[in-house]
């Protein structure tokens, strides 16, 4: 069973002569062992105008949700393919680091998201890149799903009883007589009806070749027999067999081709699976890093809007211990309530909505 691993990115303004991180760490980690904390360095991004920040802030949470969804879809796809939990699969690493290590050692990728770009340009770049990854995932996973369904369908055909299963791998050219005048009928009968069938098949219809019945295959409940007769009486023979509650399986020699097609489908599925695993392992880090960079933009934008400029705030990465969320939130509330009750609308820390915190709080939730 997977567990949700939650990280918080919080932010609060620095105070003269006080280290915000030390204060938070003292009360949540050193004194109470409720959380693992790490200073989180946010870069000096371009602020732009107040209106542009407000507009961008309205868009960020929606984009965040979309990017998160794509990132987790890639991880789930890989889990489905290899059967390994997302947090346990070593292939789900970020430049050789585990997910917690990457978050704790985060450094802004200036080569990919140049700090000279505006915030809007950075967000658009992230959104565009992840959108393409998502489109590629849909195409590749759809292809694999289609192949899997086709293979499963063929396997079902080959695994049923003789009344319904494919006969492609049971009947060979040696079982068939096919000339201008003669044809071969394939009859499925219950095992308990074998004696009755052998006693009557020669006379059940006109122009059935005597002593032509040969057992071709059997399963737990049925026998498959071949019978040679004149072509023009095939339909009459079939009708008489059906009247006996037996089954005639229509089959032509060229129907053997699906056996080769099934083998090809199986091979295609195997190759597609290998390709999709490789793609997921290459693109998961790209999507995850884009997601975390977007979280950083969110923290920066909300901090500037909340605390003003020149910006002088400290971001902290927190990983609360399991079951300690409320206690940590209560400590943070007491620590930062001086920032103003206007930000919490009279609500206390039992409400887990980010907008009610007097400090900035952005969550990074991950299943492992």
Curated annotation (Swiss-Prot):
Keywords: Hydrogen ion transport, Ion transport, Transport. InterPro entries: ATPase_V1-cplx_csu, Vac_ATP_synth_c_sf. It holds the Pfam family V-ATPase_C. GO terms for molecular function: proton-transporting ATPase activity, rotational mechanism. One of its GO terms (cellular component) is early endosome. Coiled coil: none annotated. The keyword Zinc does not apply. Belongs to the V-ATPase C subunit family. V-ATPase is a heteromultimeric enzyme composed of a peripheral catalytic V1 complex (components A to H) attached to an integral membrane V0 proton pore complex (components: a, c, c', c'' and d). Subunit of the peripheral V1 complex of vacuolar ATPase. Subunit C is necessary for the assembly of the catalytic sector of the enzyme and is likely to have a specific function in its catalytic activity. V-ATPase is responsible for acidifying a variety of intracellular compartments in eukaryotic cells. This is V-type proton ATPase subunit C. It comes from Dictyostelium discoideum (Social amoeba).
């Amino acid at each position: 069973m997977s567990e949700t691993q939650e990280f918080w990115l919080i932010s609060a303004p620095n105070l003269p002569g006080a280290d915000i991180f030390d204060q938070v760490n003292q009360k949540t980690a050193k004194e109470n062992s409720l959380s693992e904390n790490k200073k989180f360095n946010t870069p000096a991004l371009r602020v732009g105008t107040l209106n542009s920040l407000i507009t961008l802030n309205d868009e960020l949470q929606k984009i965040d949700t979309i990017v998160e969804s794509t990132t987790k879809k890639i991880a789930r796809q890989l889990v489905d393919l290899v059967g390994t939990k997302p947090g346990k699969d070593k292939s789900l690493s970020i430049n050789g680091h585990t997910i917690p290590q990457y978050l704790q050692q985060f450094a802004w990728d200036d080569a990919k998201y140049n700090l000279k770009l505006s915030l809007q340009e950075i967000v658009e770049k992230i959104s565009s890149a992840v959108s393409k990854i998502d489109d590629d995932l849909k195409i590749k996973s759809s292809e694999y799903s289609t192949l899997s369904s086709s293979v499963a369908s063929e396997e079902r055909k080959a695994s049923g009883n003789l009344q319904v299963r494919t006969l492609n791998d049971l009947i060979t050219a040696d079982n068939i007589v096919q000339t201008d005048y003669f044809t071969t009928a394939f009859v499925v009968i219950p095992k308990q009806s074998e004696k009755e069938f052998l006693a009557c098949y020669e006379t059940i219809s006109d122009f059935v070749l005597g002593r032509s019945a040969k057992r071709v295959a059997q399963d737990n409940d049925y026998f498959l027999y071949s019978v040679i007769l004149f072509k023009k009486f095939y339909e009459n023979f079939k009708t008489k067999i059906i009247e006996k509650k037996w089954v005639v399986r229509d089959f032509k020699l060229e129907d053997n081709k699906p056996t080769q097609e099934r083998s090809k489908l199986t091979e295609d599925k195997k190759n597609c699976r290998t390709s999709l695993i490789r793609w997921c392992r290459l693109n998961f880090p790209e999507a995850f890093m884009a997601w975390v960079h977007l979280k950083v933009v969110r923290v920066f934008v909300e901090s500037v809007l909340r605390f003003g400029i020149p910006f002088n705030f400290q971001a902290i990465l927190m990983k609360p211990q399991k079951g300690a969320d409320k206690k940590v939130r209560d400590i943070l509330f007491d620590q930062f309530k001086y920032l103003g009750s206007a930000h919490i609308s009279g609500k206390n820390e039992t409400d887990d909505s980010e907008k009610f915190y007097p400090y900035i709080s952005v969550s990074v939730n991950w299943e492992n």
